Amino acid sequence: MKYHHGNLKEELISSACKICEANGHAHMSLRSIAKEANVSQTAPYRHFKTKEDLLAEVSKKGFEKLGEILNQASCQNDNMTAKERFIEMGFAYVKFGLERRNTYDLMHSPIIDKVEFPELLEAASAAFDELIKIIAELNPGISDTDLSRQCIRHWAQVHGLVDLVGDAKI
């Protein structure tokens, strides 16, 4: 067991991400995370007051990764049309949700009150902003209201597809 750790907080978050993805957030505990990080059972409490604090960090990392993946999909090829990049973003979103199903479920779980975690809310918003940018590019001059409606509609479609395919309903 390690008693001195370079960046304990990041190591704990990394361990929590691994456990979440392997077993789901319901099977995570601060004790299991400490064991995965090879630190004392009390070490996580130095950085996280509650399990929810740590879950919020795991969720934030998931949204950051999703935003990065969506950005890459929308910028992957300058020769692609906006519509083609939009379609690639949809595929990337579904792939992320299916390949990282446990993290994805946590990201969209009501177990974490995003309002209580501004950095998590910011990461989630940044990922959604990737969709806003491409929809706005596809629809020059679109009103804010219509842009919002289209974004929610398209997000609901890919989100629903992840849930249906992930739950083997289709």
Predicted regions and their residues:
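Amphipathic alpha-helical packing segments from all-alpha helical-bundle domains
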Residues: N71, H108, V115-G141, S148-I152
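Helix-turn-helix
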Residues: E11, S15, A22-D53
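Hydrophobic alpha-helical segments that form the core
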Residues: I132, D144-D167
